[in-house]
């Protein structure tokens, strides 16, 4: 009897250990199943985020780079109907569900930019600074001209940094100061004389400043400016274009809309703003309004350039027309 009471604690200890192992095994199995379930749910959620997009119906996959969605999916998890973007004008650089491609960037020569890599269906245009221009910001919307050194160069101008110039010594500074003091009076005289001459020419009026006949003057007021819009935009800054169209009837809402449609492309913003102004103004007297607006903004050189180009085109068209009439008369 005493032997039984001695063995009883050992038996109870073994039973407790066995029950503990069973419980731990069940808990481990439950945790393992819970982990697998969470893994499946995570996989499904990831698939939903990466491969599905709700727009009408669930499309299984996005359109690849260089293409856009032609129409919405009609059946859940159907393959989308994708069509290529317009080569050289539009692109998409990653998979997406949009029905539109992005417009290619334009490198604005007026801001010192040129094309480094042309736009393709899968890659936007890459711009760089023109020779003798630089840009030291992360995103370049315009490049600045390199400084020209008068007294020697320490570091040459690069695409990302301006020229570093040597400084002039104090004796040279004193010499230049004396020369400058001697030159100031004649320079002031010449400037004043030119300003007075220019003022007199401007007050002469259009009939005295041009030799065009009345027929040509009438045609100038009705000239079609649409083919000159790009040239005009290239000679103006974005702020100058906005100020001009704002003063000539384009609403702030339209200006903001064009800005938002072309956030990264200032050259396209200028072109679209001028085209919108021209559509609102129509052809009648648009040329005169433009020339006066450019002169008011201090862009007299650009105004004269555009005026000369238009007159040249009109003269050429008139000569061709007269030649054709003479040929018909001879026949």
UniProtKB/Swiss-Prot annotation:
Membrane topology field: Single-pass type I membrane protein
BP GO terms, sorted: activation-induced cell death of T cells; extrinsic apoptotic signaling pathway in absence of ligand; immune response; motor neuron apoptotic process; necroptotic signaling pathway; negative regulation of apoptotic process; regulation of stress-activated MAPK cascade
Taxonomic superkingdom: Eukaryota
Signal sequence bounds: 1-25
Lipidated residue numbers (S-palmitoyl cysteine): 196
TNFR-Cys repeats: 47-83, 84-127, 128-166
Cytoplasmic-facing ranges: 193-331
GO molecular function, one term: calmodulin binding
Region described as Interaction with HIPK3: 209-313
Subcellular location field: Cell membrane; Membrane raft
Modifications made to the protein after synthesis: Palmitoylated. Palmitoylation by ZDHHC7 prevents the lysosomal degradation of FAS regulating its expression at the plasma membrane.
Segments of this protein annotated with the region Interaction with CALM: 226-250
Residues that bear Phosphothreonine: 211, 318
Modified residues (Phosphoserine): 221
InterPro entries per record: DEATH-like_dom_sf (IPR011029), Death_dom (IPR000488), Fas_rcpt (IPR008063), TNFR/NGFR_Cys_rich_reg (IPR001368), TNFRSF6_death (IPR033998), TNFRSF6_N (IPR033999)
A Pfam family hit: Death
Protein name: Tumor necrosis factor receptor superfamily member 6
Organism: Cercocebus atys (Sooty mangabey)
The gene coding this protein: FAS
